[in-house]
Amino acid sequence: MYEVKLASFHGPLDLLLHLIKQYEIDIYDISMKILTEQYINYIKDVTDLDINVHGDYLVMASELLRIKSRMLLPESTETVEETEDPREGLMNQLIEYQNYRMLAEILNEKKKEEEKYFIKRGNDLSRFEKVDTSLELELVDLITAYYKAKQRQHVVKPTISMARDTYSIEDATKNIIENLQQKQSITFADFVTFSETKTQIVTLFMALLELMKTETVKIRQERTFGDIYIERGRRYNG
């Protein structure tokens, strides 16, 4: 029997994008009948479903059913123009998440390119050796964590400070290090929720990549789809 697992996806939106591509569904005019049926069929067939870990998938299933049922309700001709499309919220989430996935791929490619080069500092007389640049979490996990944080930004109050004009990698790097001077670890969700522009977000990821590569910081995740923490790395010197 073919095993269907959720481990290959980074959350319900990732699965939805997979189904949209597989069944050639227009993301701007989503067929809720097809998408809902295929999503629920997929969830029913998974062999590694753990409610404690994959609860988000079940929440999305109920949301899809809610949207589908709303679309089946008859609309008054007088209010058709004023009625909001029940799919609009889902469509916006999918498009935004798709953009962050693309960003993750771009950053991943940049990371691979940078790993081809190794810098020997002039005052470092130790034996030259390649630094292990493997990450404890993939970039797409960071993107997913950011997306979830943005969804919670109206209910989660940021607990750390972040400069409003953080546009350079140097500024973002300094900001991360300064926050780690005050705390042993930073909740990733709180940190990026305070980012106000996409420029800041990209800059933050680039700075975090550099700090992780030099082992100045490290990241950990206690459970799948749980909060991601930025912590002081082996070479942190704040």
Swiss-Prot record:
Primary localization class, coarse: cytoplasm
Task performed by this protein: Participates in chromosomal partition during cell division. May act via the formation of a condensin-like complex containing Smc and ScpB that pull DNA away from mid-cell into both cell halves.
GO biological process: cell division; chromosome segregation; DNA replication
GO cellular component entries: cytoplasm
Cytoplasm found in the keyword field: yes
Keyword Zinc: no
Domain of life according to the entry: Bacteria
UniProt keyword terms in alphabetical order: Cell cycle, Cell division, Chromosome partition, Cytoplasm
Subunit structure: Component of a cohesin-like complex composed of ScpA, ScpB and the Smc homodimer, in which ScpA and ScpB bind to the head domain of Smc. The presence of the three proteins is required for the association of the complex with DNA.
Gene name for this UniProt entry: scpA
Name of this chain's protein: Segregation and condensation protein A
Source species of the chain: Macrococcus caseolyticus (strain JCSC5402) (Macrococcoides caseolyticum)
Family: Belongs to the ScpA family.
Compartment(s) of residence: Cytoplasm
